[in-house]
Amino acid sequence: MKPYSDNIIFYDSEFTSLDPYKGEILSIGLIKMNGEELYLELEYDGEVSDFVKDNILPYLKGKKVSREEAREKIRKFIGGKESYLVAYVDSYDSIYWNKLFKIKDSTKNNQQPAFWMTIDFASMLFGLGINPESYNYKDKDNFYKKIGVDASKYREHNALDDAKLLREVYLKFYQSISKVMPK
C-alpha cells in the first residue's frame, strides 16, 4: 500500500478550549516528511479551560507571535505547493487551523497555504480495522509497540512533539502495515 501523495505535513495544535466558538489556538507544530519542522506559540490573553491551565499553559515558554506572524511563518514554511495536512484526529485541529487562517468557506481556498481537506489518521486506522484508541500510549494493546515506536521520547500535549510522533508513526505504519493489520 502506498499513500496518494508524499507532499504531507503532519500537524498538531493546542488550543484554549474544546468549544470552537470560544477557543483559540495557543500553539501549532508542523513537520514535513523530510523532517523540517516549525513550532509556534501564539499570543493570547483570554479565557482558557481548567485542563489547559493545568496541562498546556505551564509548558508554553517560547516567544509568542501574533496571529498574523503565525500565518506568514506557516505560509513560508509550507511554500508554494499545496500540501496535505495530516492530524491524528483532525476535528479540533482543523477548526482552529481554519480560524487562524480566517476560513469561512472551504471552496474559497486562497486564504490558506495547504490543501483544504485535512487527512485524519485515526480514520485511516479505523478504516483498516485498527482501533484508533490503541494510538494512546497508555492503551494495553499499544499500537506503538506493534510498529516499533518509542512514544516516551515525546512530550504529551506539546504541538510539535505530537506532530513529530504522528510523523514517526505514519512512516513506521507504512513500513510495517502487515504487522498491525487485524488477522
Go through the PLM ranges and name each one.
Residues D6-T16:
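Two-metal-ion RNase H-like nuclease active-site motif
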